[in-house]
Amino acid sequence: MIERMIGLQGSIFDLAEECAPGPLDGMQRTELTRGAWVDHLPGWVQGSGQLFDRLVEVLPWHAEERQMYDNVVAVPRLTKYYGSRETLPDPLLDDLRDRLSAHYLPELGEPLTSAGLCLYRDGADSVAWHGDTIGRGSTHDTIVAIVSVGAARTLALRPRGGGPTAHRFSLGHGDLVVMGGSCQRTWEHAIPKSTSATGPRISIQFRPRGVR
């Protein structure tokens, strides 16, 4: 499973730096439509290559399968989920979650509690158009904060209901993106397949209670 990953050409500076988050005051907000918005902060986690290596090594990555019509197909990525009462696998994840919780508490009104991780091994791994609408995300404004480590991949967004991609964010190497407001129920996001991916990527998604 993990052996399928193509080589990751990380920056020697990224690997040499202390692995730690920077300040959040450089965040840039993009207002979408219908009360949705996206915040973006490139390179929030310095030295993120170290975190990537640790997570690849220590996580019990799970290869999911799903029923599709008459066939059972492999989900094109590896996953691991940590609920609000579970211990996160790396102390830096606790730090990232707590910093984001404090920053967004005035808007969200509650902390981020869970962490879902996805490992995109190469450009063939992907996630289709969707919103995080399991639980309260289908009816309430919420926040999903995503920290990316490893090689960059494109996060695409479009209004719910179909149509062309309206916004693209290149995410990797410690980048942060936060989807907020009505984004999960009025917009969709995806990680498209890529023929130009330069290596594997891990997406770390922090969510509040009751949002998946």
What is each PLM-predicted segment?
Residues M1-R212:
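Non-heme Fe(II) oxygenase metal-center motifs and adjacent flexible, charged/small-residue loops
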